[in-house]
Regions:
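N-terminal pre-domain/capping segments
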Residues: 1-104, 136, 174, 201, ...
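Acidic/histidine-rich catalytic cores of soluble enzymes
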Residues: 2, 31, 37, 71, ...
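A short, acidic, flexible beta-alpha connecting loop/helix-capping segment that sits on the rim
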Residues: 10, 254-269
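Active-site acidic/histidine proton-transfer and metal-coordination neighborhood
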Residues: 18, 62-64, 77-178, 238, ...
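Short acidic/polar active-site loop segments enriched in Thr and Asp
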Residues: 29, 67, 109, 204, ...
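Flexible loop residues that form catalytic
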Residues: 36, 76, 116, 182, ...
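Active-site clefts of carbohydrate-active enzymes
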Residues: 216, 224-228, 250-261
Length: 284
């Protein structure tokens, strides 16, 4: 397995070339870029990113020997794919098409998408129906691009068990519609290693973060808590890595983490995260 970092972790004032150089020098093997609103950061992809800009980023990636692993986004919200408003769903499709275009141009093997979500006054049934409709409308383009399109388990109340994800992925029925599994996002209420076992070969990409449960009764499940630095929470890494290996995953562990210590420089933080991922990989 290899070490990657999501670009949201990086100082927002850092441009593409400096970011790629810094992450390569601090020990990473890859980077995940993001499609964001214009102005989000100096290293965001946007709906307006041109072919020339993508060519330049590709050149930087090749020069620094730091590959683009995947393309995430902040623009799908928690529910846009399943929104009752058709305009919202059309925007979701535009975002996903942009992710596919960027992934293809930059050599990334996958993108991350967020289906569902259940805001007030919208049912689970409708959210799922509309999310699936949005995905199936894009299925021909996903398969033509040959880009793994991973649905992620986020905190939007949609995927509350691995079987929810399995049902959704299997209904889409495509070798390119898979799971982008976030190891830390289920720790508050479940056991992450067993999600990996259940999802199996559906997993295409992995996010890593850590979570500290708020109590100890019933194993600490449903006791609150908070996200913490890697290796400082309750993720059972000694079980997670063997579980990933057992389902055939040997890709990048992409950290989606944020610097909380204002006294620490960004480069020192990147080194700390890279070292933590290396420990996670080698300790199991």
């Amino acid at each position: 397995m290899k070490k990657a970092l999501n670009a949201w972790t990086v100082d927002s004032t850092t441009g593409f070339e400096e970011m790629f150089l810094q992450l390569k020098e601090t020990g990473f093997d890859g980077i995940e870029l993001n499609v964001d609103e214009v102005g989000h950061s100096q290293h965001s992809l946007t709906l307006e990113t041109s072919d020339a800009e993508l060519d330049n980023i590709k050149t930087i990636s090749e020069k620094t020997q730091l590959p683009v692993v995947s393309i995430s986004t902040s623009m799908l919200g928690g529910y846009r794919m399943g929104a009752p408003d058709e305009a919202d769903r059309e925007l979701a499709k535009k975002v996903i098409r942009t992710q596919l275009k960027c992934a293809k141009a930059l050599g990334a093997s996958g993108i991350l998408i967020v289906p569902g979500g259940v805001p007030q006054q919208k049912s689970f049934i409708k959210a799922r129906e509309l999310s699936m409709r949005t995905l199936l409308e894009l299925k021909p383009e996903i398969e033509e691009a040959k880009i793994n399109t991973g649905v992620e388990n986020v905190w939007n109340g949609f995927f509350m068990s691995p079987f929810d994800m399995i049902s959704f992925i299997d209904e889409a029925d495509s070798p390119y519609i898979r799971a982008y599994y976030d190891v830390g996002n289920v720790v508050a209420f479940s056991w992450t290693e067993y999600w990996i076992e259940a999802l199996g070969s559906r997993i295409s990409h992995i996010h890593v973060k850590d979570f500290k449960r708020g109590g100890t009764a019933f194993g600490g499940l449903n006791s609150g808590g908070s996200f913490v630095d890697l290796l400082k929470g309750d993720v059972n890494w000694e079980a997670v890595i063997p579980a990933l290996k057992s389902v055939g995953f040997d890709g990048y562990l992409t950290a989606e983490v944020f610097k909380n210590n204002e006294a620490m420089s960004y480069t020192d933080y990147y080194k700390e995260v890279a070292k933590a991922i290396e420990t996670i990989i080698t300790k199991a």
